[in-house]
């Protein structure tokens, strides 16, 4: 999906709450890899962490994260692929999109025009079958006119919430399907992966027919979401890409475009998403990311962000069935 120019009115007709207008990404020349300075630390009378300098870069395209004391948690402290086990919620027969949209992704606000997005959207025709992402028990099947599951009554419209059989590190995991035209299951029913739980619609606060999918960890509430992109099982030969974009002070930069290029075609725009709008949205407990991209073919990529008039480019390798992680520090 290549979109170079967006019109606010057109985008609003596609997505829940609309999406930010991303500028035409700047075409790259031969990318220049920004060298990572070897940090030195001056000891003080009080105990301070001892940081191990990053090794000298090698020809490998896998970046070495530079650890900064101001960021918590540090990137990839444990294998991030540990919870890539949810199936695609859209039926393979669908004529619509089986990939989460990137123009109003998890953590977006549409430039501050809309509520912080706590899930991902799949644009599909009304009536498209929606499938269970995993085995689980239906704990909600109906609408949210009386019981609030989001910001307000009738926020999701017709919805289904599953408590999944499989837990993550002993913690309960929930999947929420919103804006359904029809609910096909009943509360208390057990479903298997791939079972149809509903049909795509636009009930509740929705513009255009689409599925809104959320992943909730620990508790079934609006404040316990995680980015579903980092829970979806990649297709064969694909992986997932995530990253963290930091400003000169080591703080996450909110809601800026992140552009991806294949390393073999550094001047050809491939895909684009954006960083999370605010720290109020939950990042992955392991990664601490502020952007993520699903269903990425295994290979080498260049990731570009632009802050002011300066561009920053970092390489990253995505391996099949795993999460590639890139950290971009926009220090001047």
What function would you assign to each model-found segment?
Residues 19-91:
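Ser/Thr-rich, Proline-interspersed low-complexity disordered segments
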Residues 264-290:
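Short, acidic Ser/Thr/Gly-rich low-complexity loop/linker segments typical of extracellular
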Residues 177, 292-294:
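Hydrophobic core positions of the immunoglobulin-like beta-sandwich fold
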Residues 114, 128, 204-207, 211-212, ...:
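Beta-strand-rich domain onsets/edges
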